[in-house]
From Swiss-Prot:
Belongs to the MPP6 family. A motif (Nuclear localization signal) lies at residues 116-133. Signal peptide: none annotated. It comes from the Eukaryota. There is a cross-link at K37, K86, K127, K150, K153 (Glycyl lysine isopeptide (Lys-Gly) (interchain with G-Cter in SUMO2)). Phosphorylated in M (mitotic) phase. Associates with the RNA exosome complex, mediated by EXOSC3. Interacts with ARHGAP18. Interacts with exosome cofactors EXOSC10 and MTREX. GO terms for molecular function: RNA binding. This is M-phase phosphoprotein 6. The modification Phosphothreonine is found at T147.
Amino acid sequence: MAAERKTRLSKNLLRMKFMQRGLDSETKKQLEEEEKKIISEEHWYLDLPELKEKESFIIEEQSFLLCEDLLYGRMSFRGFNPEVEKLMLQMNAKHKAEEVEDETVELDVSDEEMARRYETLVGTIGKKFARKRDHANYEEDENGDITPIKAKKMFLKPQD
């Protein structure tokens, strides 16, 4: 049985140049056919399922009005890019003007209310820094305002 089988050399060994000189025409044809199969286009084609396209989250608007009030895109801070900072000032000038107008219109506290708050503040801070014996000299009004009690200094007659 062992004698019936002929040992064959590997394909890689037969492809080497020095081995091809002594090969038969049949084995040469077989090697060429195998090489053609390896190099053919079908060999390099990948049988992968087609990739699904990802859902696009693009929203299309008919009008460009949404883009009108946007700030200028390029930004620079602390003098890093002076040219861009100049452009920022020009492009964002109208937004700053609108913000300044909004700040002047909004008054959180009126002048009268500020004056009342200042009066109460003077009393509370005065009480905070007063000496211990002077703490008793402060009293609260019905509004919760703390005011100092100033006792008039008068001459006391000595009693006989």
